[in-house]
């Protein structure tokens, strides 16, 4: 596969992390799953900056976000596969 655009830390993760300057809408992105050294691709729906997350699957309100194989928050507004995952649609479960 070509250069990596998105890293997925654990095979159970439902988000990946952008590792290039930015992803543009409708960009075909190359993903690398670190845990098992597998590759896959996804098409972005939005512009997503470096270090931000992208949904690897459709996520519904109330779903748990998994990163590093761990619960990092809950979906507060439905997110489609390929969309930007950030504070506008995910909140912590801590408060």
What feature does the model see in each segment?
Residues 2-95:
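N-terminal small-residue-enriched
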